[in-house]
């Protein structure tokens, strides 16, 4: 369970930077 909680807590850390890159890419594209 502890490993699962760690994995879940690590998801936002990976998705947030990816979302920022996507937003930046879209902004540059337009």
Swiss-Prot record:
Where expressed (tissues)? Expressed by the venom gland.
Q: Which cellular component terms (GO) are annotated to the entry?
A: extracellular region
- Misc: The mature peptide does not contain cysteine residue.
Keyword check for Secreted, yes or no. Answer: yes
Question: What protein am I looking at?
Answer: Conopeptide Vi002
Species per Swiss-Prot/TrEMBL record: Conus virgo (Virgin cone)
Alphabetized UniProt keyword annotations: Secreted
Q: Where does the protein end up?
A: Secreted
């Amino acid at each position: 369970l502890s490993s699962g909680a760690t994995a879940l807590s690590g998801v936002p850390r990976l998705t947030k930077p990816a979302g920022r890159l996507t937003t930046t890419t879209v902004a540059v594209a337009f």
